Amino acid sequence: MGGISVWQLLIIAVIVVLLFGTKKLRGIGGDLGSAVKGFKKAMSDEDSAKNEKDADFEPKSLEKQQQKEAAPETKKDKEQA
C-alpha cells in the first residue's frame, strides 16, 4: 500500500516531460552518459598505469644475458674436447 505504483510513475514521467521538454531531457541524458563514460575511462586508465609500472627497476633483456652465458660455455666445451 505504501509503495509507488506503475500508474503513479507514469504520471510523474508525463509531468517531467511537460515541464522540461524532450530536447532538454535528451540533452541531460546525453550529458549524464558522457560523464559516466569519462569516469569509466579514467578509472581504466588509472588501473592500466598501475599495472604497467609494477617494479622500481628497469627490466633487463634475457637475450643479452643468454648470449653472455653461451660464449664461455663454448670455450669450456672446446677445452674439454
Swiss-Prot record:
Major localization class: membrane
Keyword flag Transport: yes
BP GO annotations: protein transport by the Tat complex
The keyword Repressor is assigned to this record: no
Transmembrane segments: 1-21
Gene3D superfamilies to which the protein is assigned, alphabetical: 1.20.5.3310
Subcellular location, record wording: Cell inner membrane
Membrane topology type: Single-pass membrane protein
Sequence segments annotated as region (Disordered): 42-81
Cross-referenced InterPro entries: TatA/B/E, TatA/E
Top-level division of the source organism's lineage: Bacteria
Task performed by this protein: Part of the twin-arginine translocation (Tat) system that transports large folded proteins containing a characteristic twin-arginine motif in their signal peptide across membranes. TatA could form the protein-conducting channel of the Tat system.
Cited PANTHER family: SEC-INDEPENDENT PROTEIN TRANSLOCASE PROTEIN TATA
Name of the protein: Sec-independent protein translocase protein TatA
Organism per entry: Vibrio parahaemolyticus serotype O3:K6 (strain RIMD 2210633)
The encoding gene: tatA
